[in-house]
Amino acid sequence: KGTFLLKEVYYRPDRVKNLKTKLNLKKIYPNMGWCDDPLSKKYNSLIKTKSNFHYEKMFRKDHKYDIIIVLDYNLKKPIPYKGSAIFIHLTKNYKSTNGCISLSKKDLLILLRLISKKTKIKIT
């Protein structure tokens, strides 16, 4: 629960072209992961996948993370076990997620055009 800024957008440049948004765009490469290991000092942040700690792969075979928006949840001075990798990402079927928000590619592309660095999302 809470109200969160939308921080930045990560995307797969080999699968997605010409994104239109006012948020910062960052490319996803094969060596990128998001640390979800509460024992790591890098908890809830982008890391290289050669880490000894557990992480979620950003460069995936499926299309789930072809485009993601990072929510400002537990990012500054992350508290272990409070939650990590809270994203808005792609889905085909709008099924529930493990704490994220999932949208169709069409809807996510529309959202990207409408949001700015001041946009907040309220999760209830």
Question: How would you name each of these model-derived features?
Answer:
Residues 1-98, 108-124:
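Cell wall/extracellular polymer interaction/catalysis modules
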Residues 99-103:
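Extended catalytic/binding region for NAD+/ADP-ribose chemistry, centered on the ART fold
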